């Protein structure tokens, strides 16, 4: 190699040093935790379904509800924007792990399956699974034992579906609980199994489903509780628990619950 070639090679090697150092610098600024990842990208992507009074759209198409409003406030506390993404409930863990969403915040029952596959917040609302029937037939089905032979609509992958299986009831799974109600209203299904919180807001006199009624509670003995789910191992769940505690202490959580009619189900945050 002549002197000029050696000089050119040396110059090229030196020119690569800053680029290599810059590459190392980028690795150092990578998110060190899930919470940092959310903050660095500047958005909290919330996985939801149409589920009043927790998550639903107003006349302008904006997402509102007890959970939706809490998610907005939590995102604001982190200094990020909130983005709502509708999901298929059966795919919630896959959506989290694939980072298409950051959190499932949608009146989610804290089952063993959920708590083993997600980093979950403390429980914040009590709930139960109830049967929804046409109002003119509700009196005929006052007990769980009387339900055999009915065709149920249930949300796929939901606690309602689990209750249908546990009780040996015939069912068809649908995309969400709102669709389950529509199936009963249209006569496609004899009954539905949905969350008691949704039933209280959506069914009966003064609602869009005045011709439907709430029937037996399927898990009255055990009940269930709602929690919020992040990716497995995420530190964002601990941050949300602290946010819940602060919101309880300030009274903001109780006021929001009263706004959406879920105050009786609210669990104290310590």
Q: Model-derived features: where do they sit?
A:
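C-terminal motif of bacterial Sec signal peptides marking the signal peptidase cleavage site
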Residues: 19-23
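Short helix-initiation/N-cap motifs at beta->coil->alpha
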Residues: 32, 84-95, 139, 157-158, ...
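Short loop->beta-strand "edge-of-pocket" segments that line small-molecule binding or catalytic clefts
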Residues: 43-48, 143-157
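Beta->alpha turn/N-cap motifs
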Residues: 47-52, 85-90, 99, 103-111, ...
């Amino acid at each position: 190699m002549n002197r000029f070639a050696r000089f050119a090679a040396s110059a090229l090697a030196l020119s690569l040093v800053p680029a290599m150092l810059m590459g190392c610098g980028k690795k150092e600024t990578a998110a060190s935790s899930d919470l940092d990842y959310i903050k660095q990208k500047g958005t909290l992507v919330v996985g939801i379904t149409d589920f009043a009074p927790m998550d639903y759209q107003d006349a302008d198409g904006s997402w509102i509800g007890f959970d939706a409003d809490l998610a907005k406030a939590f995102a604001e506390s982190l200094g990020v924007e909130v983005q709502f993404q509708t999901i298929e409930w059966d795919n919630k863990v896959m959506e989290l792990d694939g980072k298409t969403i950051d959190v499932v915040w949608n009146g989610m029952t804290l089952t063993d399956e959920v708590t083993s596959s997600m980093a979950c917040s403390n429980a914040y609302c009590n709930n139960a699974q109830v049967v929804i029937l046409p109002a003119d037939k509700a009196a005929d089905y006052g007990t769980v034992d009387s339900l055999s032979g009915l065709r149920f609509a249930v949300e796929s992958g939901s606690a309602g579906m689990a209750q249908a299986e546990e009780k040996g009831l015939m069912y068809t799974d649908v995309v969400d609980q709102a669709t389950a109600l529509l199936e009963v209203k249209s006569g496609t299904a004899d009954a539905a199994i949905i969350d008691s919180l949704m039933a209280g807001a959506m069914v009966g006199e003064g609602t869009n489903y005045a011709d439907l009624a709430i029937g037996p509670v399927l898990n009255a003995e055990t009940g269930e509780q709602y929690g919020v789910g992040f990716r497995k191992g995420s530190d964002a769940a601990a941050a949300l628990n602290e946010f819940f505690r602060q919101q309880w202490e300030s009274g903001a959580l109780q006021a929001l619950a009263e706004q959406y009619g879920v105050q009786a189900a609210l669990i104290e945050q310590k």
